[in-house]
Amino acid sequence: MALPNIADARKLGDEELATEILATKQRLFQLRFQQATRRPENPHEFKHARHRLAQLLTVERERQLENSPSEEA
């Protein structure tokens, strides 16, 4: 399984992006719980979820910076 592509995250709308961030955070919580209580089925899935969350948060931040007025003016 390959790591998720950031281009896919950039194609999402604002609502979809927020939903995806929430879903990924919930998945990470489940994986952490799974790691603490028993051996995870797919150990690499934790890395992929963290990577995906970082991508989604990066895209969200890029959009925030695009929409904010420039402070240099």
From Swiss-Prot:
Q: Which Pfam families match?
A: Ribosomal_L29 (PF00831)
Question: What biological-process GO terms show up in the record?
Answer: translation
Q: Which GO terms describe its cellular component?
A: cytosolic large ribosomal subunit
Coiled coil region boundaries:
none
SUPFAM superfamilies (alphabetical):
Ribosomal protein L29 (L29p)
**What keywords would UniProt list here?**
Ribonucleoprotein, Ribosomal protein
Check the record and name the InterPro entries matching this protein: Ribosomal_protein_uL29, Ribosomal_uL29, Ribosomal_uL29_CS, Ribosomal_uL29_sf
Output the Gene3D superfamilies linked to this UniProt entry: 1.10.287.310
Q: Which GO terms describe its molecular function?
A: structural constituent of ribosome
Give the family this protein belongs to, as stated in its UniProt record: Belongs to the universal ribosomal protein uL29 family.
Q: Which PANTHER family match?
A: 60S RIBOSOMAL PROTEIN L35/50S RIBOSOMAL PROTEIN L29, LARGE RIBOSOMAL SUBUNIT PROTEIN UL29C
What is the protein's given name? Large ribosomal subunit protein uL29
Origin organism of this chain?
Answer: Synechocystis sp. (strain ATCC 27184 / PCC 6803 / Kazusa)
Which taxonomic lineage does the organism of this UniProt entry have?
Answer: Bacteria, Bacillati, Cyanobacteriota, Cyanophyceae, Synechococcales
